[in-house]
Amino acid sequence: MAIDVLVGLQWGDEGKGKIVDVLTSSYDIIARFQGGPNAGHTIEFEGHKHVLHTIPSGIFNTNALNLIGNGVVVDPVIFKNEIDGLQKFNLDINSKLLISNRAHIILPTHKMIDASSEASKGKKKIGSTLKGIGPTYMDKTGRNGIRIGDLKSENWTNKLKCSFCARIGCSIEICPCKCHKMKLKVIEH
């Protein structure tokens, strides 16, 4: 089996999503292995415009399995909105989309830290999208993050309370979109 990998050599926005969209009809598996919802790719499918931030663009290929790997950081609100938007067009998400149980979740506190960090840089700010991606990867590498697989546990909120949220003394509404109740196929590994 041949494998092709599309990798961007800049900071994103090179048009990877458009290239993948063109090529998806030739592949059985489309996998997203890293990144977050800071950018999106716009796809026209059956006369309708769709903007995807997390879900691979192979979702429109009726024969392709789409994977979201453990290197991807997922904003549950954006992810749920994408799924809801696609289901309005009767796309069979449940049989075509798998997500790693090790993919990390972007929390509201990650966005707060991102905004605070960017503001503190003054004229030297980096132009963050303020979507919490950098702080989520910091938690991932520091082994403090909340992962998709954690949502299966009855007491996943305890892990959240024991994470950096408790250390920095903030309070957040825990998963207001109820995305932890979505029925998705999760890859156990």
Label every PLM stretch briefly.
Residues 160-189:
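Catalytic phosphate/metal-binding cores of nucleic-acid and nucleotide-processing enzymes, i.e., regions
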Residues 1-159, 163:
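Non-transmembrane, aqueous-exposed alpha-helical and coiled segments at domain scale
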